[in-house]
From Swiss-Prot:
One of its GO terms (biological process) is prolyl-tRNA aminoacylation. It is an enzyme of class 6 (ligase). This is Proline--tRNA ligase 2. Homodimer. It comes from Bacillus cereus (strain ZK / E33L).
């Protein structure tokens, strides 16, 4: 059994896609369902999502947002109201045409996202500026009929959080859009240990129907980018289409200013590809379902299991801890919990008990140390923080070492062909250049970062005057 567990993971250097698939299966995060592209979230995978959800939910509620729930079905006529929006999602929509044996008078779309439902609701409940703002959030699943699927990264159905807010002024909606983006960025960095780049999407890459889309972008271990979260400012695009008006402070009718934003289980895919290694997952401690696992050595000997249980009682005051008292061998257990990425492993056997110590092993560095049992309650929280910082710094160094600055087309093509990572280059703002870089270099615009750099005066593609620096890259 242990041997099978060890040989199950393909090395990431040999086949990154297979390495990823091996991990999500062997670490028992997901299983495949009988419907193509739909995944079964197993207890370990769902516990990870619950921890992420709990943090995010608390942060949203602390900033005045309320949870609601909308239906999963959207009438076709409602979806058609915002032209750009429906065109953007049309290829991915799943339709319900029958109720039992009876054909429906109107097709129902299974929500790919819920803007239209929120808009219809807002149009009914808002009368005056006194009704604003409305700050709503929804936890749900959505369906997008993807052609190519991979667990967490791109699935037919996935879990997410989608926020929808309406405001009195353009300034308020813009502030909300950026505040949420900052919330997402701090969540990624402070809880998932994933460094992100904040910026704005180009017109080509923005959300269908949005006035502006902002994004956080992360770099995976194979050098590809992952759009980890987005925040959209709709302006009045949707409120005009759905007639969401209010009486302002002067008694005039105005359209509300609107935002939408979301993150999903795709973040779990990012977590795997940023921190994982050839032995399996490496869990960021703050969201790890189990932070400490205790493995009794020679547990059949008197006092060993009792001591492990006693230690668990102390540690559970400061961390999420479990004991594996199964009859599997210690070697099997070591491999199993390495695969699952549990941040800290404690080994305790008869000799350790004699010396009042345990063997502590870090998952991220494999470092072993002997530590007094009396120090565990104090040492473990500090070590979990240390592991988080180490993971973040390692990921940041990797990103920085795989970010390249170029000033001309040939240089950009050479880097894209020979390296993996982000490419920083100046851009004129023209769609034709963006499309040429996609076709001939194989990179898409990831974002126009808030932290701009002046690398050159000319566009990397056409040589005309550049307007901004853009991060480019291959992406999931």
């Amino acid at each position: 059994m242990a041997k099978e567990q060890v040989q199950a993971i393909t090395k990431m250097e040999e086949d990154f896609a297979q390495w990823y698939t091996d991990i999500v299966k062997k670490a028992e995060l997901v299983d495949y369902s009988s419907v193509k592209g739909c995944m079964i979230l197993r207890p370990y995978g769902y516990a990870l999502w619950e921890n992420m959800q709990k943090v995010m939910d608390e942060k949203l509620k602390a900033t005045g947002h309320e949870n609601v729930y909308m239906p999963m079905f959207i009438p076709e006529s409602l979806l058609q109201k915002e032209k750009d929006h429906v065109e953007g999602f049309a290829p991915e929509v799943a339709w319900v045409t029958h109720g039992g044996d009876e054909k429906l008078a109107e097709r129902l779309c299974i929500r790919p996202t819920s803007e239209t439902l929120f808009c219809e609701h807002f149009s009914k409940i808002v009368q005056s500026y006194n009704d604003l703002p409305k700050l709503y959030n929804q936890w749900c699943s959505v369906v997008r009929w993807e052609k190519t699927t991979r667990p967490f990264l791109r699935t037919t159905e996935f879990l997410w959080q989608e926020g929808h807010t309406i405001h009195e002024t353009a300034e308020e909606s813009q502030a909300e859009t950026l505040n949420i983006l900052n919330l997402y960025a701090s969540f990624c960095e402070d809880y998932l240990a994933i460094p992100v780049i904040k910026g704005q999407k180009t017109e080509k890459e923005k959300f269908a129907g949005a006035k502006a889309t902002y994004t956080i972008e992360s770099l995976m271990h194979d050098g590809k980018a992952l759009q980890t979260g987005t925040s959209h400012n709709f302006g009045t695009n949707f409120s005009e289409a759905f007639d969401i008006k209010f009486l302002d402070r002067t008694g005039k009718w105005q359209y509300v200013h609107q935002t939408s934003w979301g993150v999903s289980t795709r973040m779990i895919g990012g977590l795997i590809m940023v921190h994982g290694d050839n032995n399996g997952l490496v869990m960021p401690p703050k969201v790890a379902p189990v932070q400490v696992v205790i493995v009794p050595i020679a547990q059949h000997k008197e006092g060993v299991l009792a001591k492990a249980i006693e230690l668990q009682g102390h540690i559970q005051k400061v961390a999420r801890v479990k004991i594996d008292a199964s009859n599997k061998t210690p070697g099997w257990k070591f491999n199993e919990y390495e695969m699952k990425g549990i941040p800290i492993r404690l080994e305790v056997g008869p000799k350790d008990i004699e010396k009042n110590q345990v063997v502590l092993v870090r998952r991220d560095t494999k470092e072993k140390e002997f530590i007094s049992m009396d120090q565990l309650e104090e040492r473990i929280p500090a070590l979990l923080e240390e592991i988080h910082n180490s993971l973040f710094n390692k990921a940041k160094v990797f990103r920085d070492e795989n970010t390249y600055s170029v000033t001309n087309f040939e240089e950009m093509k050479k880097i894209a062909d020979e390296k993996q990572g982000f490419i920083k280059a100046m851009w004129c703002g023209e769609l034709a250049c963006e499309e040429k870089l996609k076709e001939e270099v194989g990179v898409s615009s990831r974002c126009m970062p808030f932290e701009q750099e002046h690398l050159a005066d000319e566009c990397v593609c056409c040589g005309k005057e550049a307007k901004q620096m853009v991060y480019w890259g291959k992406a999931y």
